[in-house]
Amino acid sequence: MDEQRAAVRRMQDYISEHIEEEIDIAALSTAACFSPWYARKIFLKHTGLTPAVYIRRLKLSKSALRLRDESCSITDIAVEMGFGSVDGYQRAFRREFGCNPKEYSLSPVPVWLFTPTLILDTERKESDMSNTRNIFIQVVEKPARKVLIKRGI
């Protein structure tokens, strides 16, 4: 299990270092020191996303930040983030965030950016349950009260 988490962490580090390049499963499997099939399987198991979806969401989130903060053209951002074409980038952006990149750059609406959860190398320790106490909760209904608020004293 520790070996799997370490491999997923190495893949996440590789992705973050090479996010503006084209990343394939062969490069990720080399970083993980596993076969491409097994690297994809453990990545999906620990992150809940396939490597392709993880990379696409990370690229789109970084491009959304660049559109919001910098005055770059959509074409430049699409090329720098490694999308094959501007049309493909615009379709992926709309599918991910629900708006066009041009509309977003002109008036940024709040969007859910993808923030990856990094796999930590620490292992959870099992807690000793011998020193625990049970807590009983009881709902008590009280009558409504009137409140008088005095302002401007």
Outline where the language-model segments fall.
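Basic, helix-initiating cap at the start of DNA-binding domains
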Residues: 1-6, 53
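A solvent-exposed interaction/effector surface
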Residues: 61, 65-68, 73, 84-153
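The short coil/loop that forms the "turn" connecting the two helices of the helix-turn-helix
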Residues: 34, 83-84
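Terminal helix-turn-helix DNA-binding modules in bacterial transcription factors
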Residues: 9-26, 44-81, 107-126
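Helix-turn-helix
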Residues: 27-40
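Short hydrophobic/aromatic patch on the recognition helix
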Residues: 37-39, 43, 88-89, 93
